[in-house]
């Protein structure tokens, strides 16, 4: 009797287990079919990121926009709102090389001019202002205006980079040669400023020498 009861319990458990498996399979199939039907009725739309175009500012448009073409040269507006000729990358690099060569020549002239500074220098006591060893260097600075030496004066790089002659470009009073006149005017303004600064420096040096002479005279009287 006991064995029959055990066998019947096992059979009932197996039947229950099989029924549960069947229910799970049916529920899974139903859910899959519902998902497929829903996807067929409502297709999923792909979301693409918005294509944001970079808008050029008016300043950029003004730089790249050609103003006019004169004598084979296309003129554009620079960042500083000056009319300048448009050059290719190779032309710009060539003119940059010329400007670098100009700078190298100026510096080599400066070095050659002052390379013997130790021999012609004066020894000055910074506390008292007294010239301990007088080699005439300070006196020559006041007597000679060294800034007028054009070999050691660097000119504007604008002409070196652009390098278009006035004859090739047309009349100097032409609208499209304002960059050349502006550069010449700026150079003259710089020269005028340099002259005023040189006059101020000379006055300061003269005042310092007067003070120094007064100190020396006092010391001589004391001694």
Curated annotation (Swiss-Prot):
Transmembrane spans: none
Biased composition (Basic residues): 1-14
Region (Disordered): 1-48, 168-202
Basic and acidic residues bias (residue ranges): 23-40
Localization (cell): Nucleus
GO molecular-function terms, A-Z: CENP-A containing nucleosome binding; histone binding
One CC-aspect GO term: nucleus
Keyword Cell membrane (UniProt): no
Acidic residues biased stretches: 184-200
InterPro entries per the UniProt record, alphabetical: Scm3/HJURP
Keywords for the protein's UniProt record, in alphabetical order: Nucleus
Example of a GO biological process term: G2/M transition of mitotic cell cycle
Major localization listed first in the record, in broad terms: nucleus
Role summary: Centromeric protein that plays a central role in the incorporation and maintenance of histone H3-like variant CENPA at centromeres.
Assembly notes: Interacts with YTA7.
Stated name of the protein: Protein SCM3
Gene of this entry: SCM3
